[in-house]
């Protein structure tokens, strides 16, 4: 008989406050909730919830990803959260609003989008 691998159980941490990092690109939205030291507590993305293709970039997909990450963080006892938003995507506001409706208290919202001081040449303009 094969030896069973002993799987490590998830430890419930008691974390009162943390930081919600929302990375919103043109193709997807990733929400990662960390403690104040930067250790990951919960994460979710539009793609991991089953949204495929162009549906990943919608505000609704960002809302669902944000709610899923918030539920995971609240299982560890999180109550208050600071929000750091990065990127130009369409799911920025929807993700923040979803965090507020799940019951997490949002204390501050910061935009941490990296802005070049005339660095690399940007991609060509889109013609839609």
From Swiss-Prot:
Located on the platform of the 30S subunit, it bridges several disparate RNA helices of the 16S rRNA. Forms part of the Shine-Dalgarno cleft in the 70S ribosome. Part of the 30S ribosomal subunit. Interacts with proteins S7 and S18. Binds to IF-3. HAMAP family: Ribosomal_uS11. The lineage of its organism: Bacteria, Bacillati, Bacillota, Bacilli, Lactobacillales. This is Small ribosomal subunit protein uS11. GO terms for cellular component: ribonucleoprotein complex; ribosome. GO terms for molecular function: rRNA binding; structural constituent of ribosome. It comes from Ligilactobacillus salivarius (strain UCC118). Belongs to the universal ribosomal protein uS11 family. It comes from the Bacteria. GO terms for biological process: translation. Keywords: Ribonucleoprotein, Ribosomal protein, RNA-binding, rRNA-binding. Pfam families: Ribosomal_S11. InterPro entries: Ribosomal_uS11, Ribosomal_uS11_bac-type, Ribosomal_uS11_CS, Ribosomal_uS11_sf.
